Regions:
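Long, compositionally biased interface segments
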Residues: 186-236
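Beta-strand elements of well-folded, non-transmembrane domains
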Residues: 23-27, 82, 117-122, 196-198
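Aromatic/basic-lined ligand-recognition segments
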Residues: 4-7, 110-189
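Short glycine-rich, low-complexity/disordered patches
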Residues: 9, 48-59, 102-125, 145-160, ...
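N-terminal low-complexity, intrinsically disordered segments
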Residues: 1-80
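Internal, hydrophobic cores of structured domains that mediate oligomerization or house catalytic pockets
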Residues: 70-141
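Short, conserved charged micro-motifs
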Residues: 27-35, 85-88, 128-129, 201-208
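Amphipathic N-proximal alpha-helical interface segments
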Residues: 57-81, 175-201
Length: 236
C-alpha cells in the first residue's frame, strides 16, 4: 500500500499517549551476569532511575522512560511529553548501545514500534450519533462518511477496527475507532494505534536506521488517517 511521504514536522501539541519500542534477539545465556552489571552501572548513569530486579527480567524506570529487559527481548516505553520526537528516543538508545550490544550480541531478530493516540471529543447534540465522531477526527480517504454507516453502526457506543498491510517492506497494523465514557456517553474518545514491524535479522547499527524508517512510516500514516481539523489543533 502506498502512503504519501510527509515532510517531518514536530507539533507543539499532540494526542500521543504511548510510545513503545520492542525488539527481540537470540537468548542471552549470560543474562544474569548482564543484569548484575547493568543494575550497578545504570544507577551511576541515571541517579533518578528506579531499578527492580525480577527473577526473569529487569525493570528500569524514571518519569521519562520505562525499560524492561528479558534474556531474549526488550520493551522500551517513552514518555511522549519528554521525548517530543522519536528522534530523541533513537538518540537516547544509540547513546546506550554498549548495554544493548552486550545484551543482544549485535543481532536483532525483530523490531516493533507502536504509538497510541487518544483524541477526546463529544457529540455536538442529541441528534448526532457516536459513529459520526469518527468522521470528525479521521480523514475522508480513511473512513466512510456518516451517511454510509448502517443502522447498526449508528447505535454503537464503541467500535475498534483493525487493519494490517505492507508499506515499504514493513508490516503495519492499525487499530482505530472510538469509545464512549461509561458515565456520560456523549463524551467520546477517538483511538488511533499504529504499529510497524521489521522481522528481518540485522545488526544493531541497521536496527537503529530501520527504527527511523519505521517511525517515518508511522508519521506518514498518521497524517493520511487524521482529519485536517485535528492537524490544525495540533499546530496550536
Amino acid at each position: 500500500m502506498d502512503i504519501p511521504k510527509i515532510e517531518h514536522y514536530i507539533y507543539p501539541s499532540t494526542f500521543l499517549r504511548t510510545i513503545e519500542w520492542v525488539f527481540t534477539y537470540p537468548q542471552n545465556k549470560e543474562f544474569e551476569d548482564w543484569k548484575t552489571h547493568t543494575v550497578t552501572s545504570w544507577k551511576k548513569l541515571d541517579q533518578k532511575s528506579k531499578v527492580q530486579v525480577k527473577q526473569e527480567y529487569l525493570d528500569i524506570q524514571t518519569p521519562n522512560y520505562k525499560f524492561s529487559f528479558w534474556s531474549d527481548k526488550c520493551i522500551l516505553r517513552f514518555n511522549p511529553d519528554y521525548f517530543t520526537s522519536f528522534g530523541l528516543a533513537v538518540e537516547f538508545i544509540d547513546n546506550l548501545k554498549d548495554y544493548f550490544l552486550s545484551l543482544c550480541g549485535n543481532k536483532i531478530k525483530l523490531s516493533r514500534i507502536r504509538k497510541v493516540n487518544l483524541i477526546p471529543g463529544g457529540r455536538e447534540d442529541d441528534d448526532s450519533t457516536n459513529i459520526g465522531f469518527i468522521g470528525c477526527i479521521f480523514s475522508d480517504r480513511f473512513v466512510q462518511k456518516e451517511d454510509n454507516y448502517t443502522e447498526f453502526d449508528q447505535g454503537l457506543v464503541a467500535k475498534i477496527t483493525q487493519a494490517t498491510f505492507i508499506n515499504n517492506g514493513y508490516e503495519v497494523t492499525l487499530n482505530y475507532g472510538f469509545s464512549c465514557n461509561k458515565k456520560d456517553n456523549s463524551q467520546l474518545m477517538g483511538i488511533l494505534e499504529i504499529s510497524t514491524i521489521d522481522n528481518k535479522i540485522c545488526a544493531f547499527s541497521n536496527f537503529i536506521k530501520n527504527a527511523e524508517r519505521m517511525n517515518g512510516i508511522i508519521f506518514d500514516i498518521f497524517h493520511w488517517c487524521i482529519s485536517d481539523e485535528i492537524l490544525a489543533i495540533m499546530k496550536n
